[in-house]
Regions:
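Bacterial N-terminal signal peptides
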Residues: 5-16
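Helical hinge/lid and interdomain linker segments adjacent to catalytic or ligand-binding clefts
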Residues: 21-24, 28-32, 36-123
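A glycine-rich, often tryptophan-bearing local segment used as a flexible ligand/cofactor-contacting loop or short
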Residues: 32, 93-171
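Active-site rim elements
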Residues: 34-37, 153-157, 173, 203, ...
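Catalytic beta-strand/loop cores that center a nucleophilic Ser/Cys/Thr
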Residues: 52, 56-60, 71, 150-220
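Proline-centered loop/turn at the N-terminus of a beta-strand
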Residues: 113-115, 194, 223
Length: 255
């Protein structure tokens, strides 16, 4: 009896070791956040906790309301070293230092995956005046040119049937509605970008036509997942939004 008990204990111990060895190792994620017009203090916690409940991630946060502080940190050599992905939830629309912006883009062109939401689409390009929108490095990284938005009303998000089984969105419902919203104008979808879902404000609100609101892009060696959804805390806190950005992280990092 003792031999049987010892054998069962040993078998259980070995199984535990094997299970631990095959457990999903945490990704290392850098959340770059801060700036104007949004409750970034609240959203950073919701985003990190929401993703980590669905996918193991060890987070580092770079939270700066002052664009000069954020720029200083993102200008340091090797700022992205050791991270499996960088998540941008920030709003620094007035940045006009092209060399600085190009240096951030180079990090992802060289292979670091990028996740971007909402006002990241309005950051780092509007005040660059000597290039066409489609030529600006940040827009090329994001995969779209966006400027402006509609009113604060809920909107419907509908998957594109052609890409309904894309890994970054396949587990999402075919259609869902945001509790609150601020639908961004996507003035141009750049070559190579795959739009996975469109947002629709309805006929009474601008923009009158559905706008791309979830998409993926490949920029150099780096995968990019982006969504323009996410202005209000109520929307960022929904299961649908947290499921969506987690799927984006999984796709971009190969998890």
């Amino acid at each position: 009896m003792k031999k049987i008990s010892a054998l069962l204990f040993l078998s259980g111990f070995i199984f535990s070791l094997v299970a631990d060895d095959h457990a999903e190792k945490p990704l290392k994620g850098l959340l770059v956040t801060g700036g104007g017009h949004h409750d970034y203090g609240f959203q950073q916690n919701v985003i990190m906790e929401g993703i980590s409940q669905r996918l193991p991630v060890k987070w580092t946060v770079m939270f700066d309301m002052d664009p000069r502080e954020s720029k200083s940190k993102l200008s340091k050599e090797g700022w992205s070293d050791g991270y499996d992905f960088v998540f941008y939830n920030h709003c620094f629309a007035r940045e006009d230092d092209k060399a600085f912006i190009d240096s951030i883009v180079k990090v992802h062109e060289d292979g670091v995956p990028a996740i971007a939401m909402h006002c990241a689409m309005h950051s780092y390009h509007i005040f660059i005046k000597d290039q066409k929108p489609e030529e600006k490095s940040w827009n090329k990284l994001m995969g779209v040119h966006s400027h402006g938005h509609g009113p604060h009303v809920p909107f419907d998000v509908t998957k594109v049937s052609e890409y309904a089984d894309h890994p970054a969105i396949k587990d999402m419902p075919d259609k869902w509605r945001t509790p609150k919203g601020e639908l961004y104008f996507i003035l141009k979808v750049l070559d190579g970008t795959k739009v996975l879902a469109y947002g629709d404000n309805g006929p009474k609100h601008k923009p009158e036509k559905p706008q791309a609101c979830v998409w993926v892009n490949q920029y150099g060696k780096g995968k990019v997942f982006a969504t323009s959804i996410g202005h209000h805390n109520e929307t960022v806190s929904t299961k649908e939004f947290l499921d969506l950005i987690t799927s984006g992280v999984r796709w971009a990092t190969g998890r």
